Amino acid sequence: MEDQKQTPSNQTATPAGDEATSTAAASPETGAPDTAAAAVDDVAAQLAALEAKASEHYDLYMRAVAEGENIRRRAQEDVAKAHKFAIENFADNLLPVMDSLQAALADGSGDIAKLREGVELTARQLAAAFERGKIVELNPVGEKFDPHRHQAISMVPADQEPNTVVTVLQRGYTIADRVLRPALVTVAAPK
């Protein structure tokens, strides 16, 4: 009993010889440093591979971010160009109208029939330009009054149903279902 150390009651006493055996088992043997070095080298190689993979993914991420910025910038430039040159096509369609008006002003013959024919031709050119520009004329005679599309100037006694358009004083126009100018109209008064 003298060989045993005093231990608390929940632990068992270990002989002195057994401690030496367990310490020897825990200490590395002569081949153990090579194994530990190999494990460290293996972990270092794995770490290097993972760092390379992370660097590659970061590079791909940065390229994707740059590409997204380029796409956004190009889209903004395209929108700016569209706004800047949207009227160009319509203006190109109006040039023949201007040419016809200038030719009419330059004509000094005084022939009213010829002048009327030129004005009618110019009006057809303008109507064609409006059609290509998707501008539609409003002719609301007989329609119910719509304050979004019509502007009532007065109410007049008429045989028509109350609140319907009787006459158009100035034509209105829409472009792609959006009112450019409401039609100036007179409306049938209630009876």
From Swiss-Prot:
Localization, UniProt: Cytoplasm
GO cellular component: a single term: cytosol
Single Gene Ontology BP annotation: protein folding
NCBIfam families on file: PRK14139.1, PRK14140.1, PRK14150.1
Compositional bias annotation for Polar residues: 1-14
Chief location bin: cytoplasm
Residue ranges crossing the lipid bilayer per the database entry: none
Family of the protein in this entry: Belongs to the GrpE family.
Low complexity bias locations: 19-35
GO molecular function: adenyl-nucleotide exchange factor activity; protein homodimerization activity; protein-folding chaperone binding; unfolded protein binding
Function: Participates actively in the response to hyperosmotic and heat shock by preventing the aggregation of stress-denatured proteins, in association with DnaK and GrpE. It is the nucleotide exchange factor for DnaK and may function as a thermosensor. Unfolded proteins bind initially to DnaJ; upon interaction with the DnaJ-bound protein, DnaK hydrolyzes its bound ATP, resulting in the formation of a stable complex. GrpE releases ADP from DnaK; ATP binding to DnaK triggers the release of the substrate protein, thus completing the reaction cycle.
Name under which the protein is recorded: Protein GrpE
Organism of this sequence: Cupriavidus taiwanensis (strain DSM 17343 / BCRC 17206 / CCUG 44338 / CIP 107171 / LMG 19424 / R1) (Ralstonia taiwanensis (strain LMG 19424))
This protein's UniProt keywords: Chaperone, Cytoplasm, Stress response
